[in-house]
Amino acid sequence: MGRFVIRRATENDVPLVLDFIRKLAEYEKLLHEVVATEEILYQSLFVEKKAEVVIAEEEGNPVGFALYFHNFSTFVGRKGLYLEDLFVLPSKRGLGYGKALLKHLAQIAVERNCGRMEWVCLDWNKSSIDFYKSMNANPMEDWTIYRLTGENLLNMAKK
C-alpha cells in the first residue's frame, strides 16, 4: 500500500462516484438497474445532503469509495450508519483498502453516536461475505429485505 488517504468526496468527484457506482453494479451483475446520473447524484449528495461519500486514494489515485447515510433503529433508540455501497477496484483488492474504508466508517459511526452500522450483500458474493465476516460483521440470518419500486411504489401510494 503506497501513500493512502481516505477523504470526503467533493462536488468535483460526482463523475468519479458515478463511475464507481457503475463499476460496482457491473461486478454485481446489476448494471442494467443503474439510472443515476451526475445531476441526480449532485442534487442528492451536495444539495439535499441525503448521503455522504468518502474516496480512498493511493498516491493520489482513486482506488475505491463508500457511500453511506444515517438510518434509525427503534430497537436501539439511536441512529445508525447504513453503508449503501463499498467498492474497491479489482486490481487493488486484497491490499487492505476495503478494511480501511470499513474502519473509517466505523470511526464515523462511533463519533456520531450511532448504535450500529449495517449493509446488505448479495448472497452469491462469497468473497465479500467472507471479507465482512473477517471484520466480525454478523449476517442477519432471520431477516428478509423487501422493496417497492416503480409502478408498485406508485400504486401503493395511491391506496
Where are the predicted features?
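Conserved GNAT-fold acetyl-CoA-binding loop/helix
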Residues: L18-S44
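A short helix-loop-beta-strand connector motif used in the catalytic cores of GNAT acetyltransferases and
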Residues: Q43-I55
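Conserved acetyl-CoA pyrophosphate-binding loop and the N-cap/start of the following alpha-helix
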Residues: K92, G96-H104
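Conserved beta-strand in the GNAT
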Residues: I55, N61-H70
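A short beta-loop-alpha structural element at the N-terminal edge
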Residues: V5-V17
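Conserved active-site alpha-helix within GNAT-family acetyltransferase domains
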Residues: K99, D123-D142
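Conserved beta-strand-loop-alpha-helix junction that forms the acyl-donor binding cleft
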Residues: W119-S128, R147-G150
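Conserved GNAT acetyl-CoA-binding A-motif
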Residues: V110-V120
